UniProtKB/Swiss-Prot annotation:
Subunit structure: Homodimer.
Protein name listed in UniProt: Phospholipase D
Top-rank lineage group of the source organism: Bacteria
InterPro entries (UniProt xref): PLD-like_dom, PLD_domain, PLipase_D/transphosphatidylase
Catalytic activity: a 1,2-diacyl-sn-glycero-3-phosphocholine + H2O = a 1,2-diacyl-sn-glycero-3-phosphate + choline + H(+)
Keywords from the UniProt entry: Hydrolase, Lipid degradation, Lipid metabolism, Secreted, Signal, Virulence
The protein's role, per its UniProt record: Could be a virulence factor.
Nucleotide-binding is among the record's keywords: no
Gene3D superfamilies per the UniProt record, alphabetical: Endonuclease Chain A
Gene name, Swiss-Prot/TrEMBL: pld
Signal peptide interval: 1-22
Annotated Gene Ontology cellular component terms: extracellular region
Keyword Secreted (UniProt): yes
Length: 205
């Protein structure tokens, strides 16, 4: 009886494994076809990338929170701007960064900003304060969220990372900021900025 039970168990396990393998193979075949099909073609997608090896001659700086201090790091870079600042932001509620941007605009620096639509309703967003300072602010109309955190300064510096331009990012969260001084990289980020600008809406109040 024991040998029959063992045989039955062995056959059952083999049967289950066979079904599982069949499902796996079929699923792999199915998703491979989807990826290769015209409806989900990766070969036709235009992908802009930048090889990290090309950054070997670039000046790269980093900042991390905690401890606090990355807001000051960003403000210092904005204060050094001479010609232009192009910015993309999800959260935009930090007073120090906002003041630095307004001061840059007042001293003749071209300041252009794209924000996520959530800033239209966020209580602490600086959107309207920036608008009142005559800064060109647009709302990125991407179907999801505009989650970029990017500042391009004088077409040669890129500030990016996980850091939202908010007090929480500096005082409460674990975040990172990276500053890369590289004209080619800045050009790549500018191309993306302008591509998002073409699908953005102006803010009226």
């Amino acid at each position: 009886m024991k040998s029959k039970n063992n045989k039955f168990i062995a056959v059952s396990i083999s049967f289950i494994l066979g079904i599982a393998l069949g499902i796996y193979v079929e699923s792999t075949y199915y998703f491979t076809n989807i990826i290769n099909s015209k409806s989900f073609s990766l070969s036709n997608a235009q992908i802009n990338y930048y090889s990290i090896s090309e950054l070997s001659r670039s000046n790269v700086s980093t900042c991390f929170t905690p401890p606090a201090g990355c807001t000051k790091f960003i403000v210092q870079q904005i204060e050094k701007a001479e010609e232009s600042i192009y910015m993309q932001a999800y959260g935009m509620s930090d007073s120090l960064i906002t003041t630095a941007l307004i001061n840059a605009q007042m001293r003749g620096v071209k300041v252009r900003i794209l924000l996520d639509r959530s800033n239209l309703k966020q209580k602490f967003s600086k959107l309207y304060e920036l608008q009142q300072a005559k800064i060109d602010v647009g709302i990125d109309t991407v179907p999801g969220i505009a989650h970029n955190k990017v500042i391009i300064i004088d077409k040669k510096k890129v500030i990016t990372g996980s850091f939202n331009f908010t007090v929480s990012a500096d005082k409460r969260n674990a975040e990172n900021v990276i500053l890369i001084e590289d004209r080619k990289l800045a050009e790549s980020y500018l191309q993306n900025w302008f591509s998002r600008k073409t699908t953005s809406n102006a803010v009226h109040f």
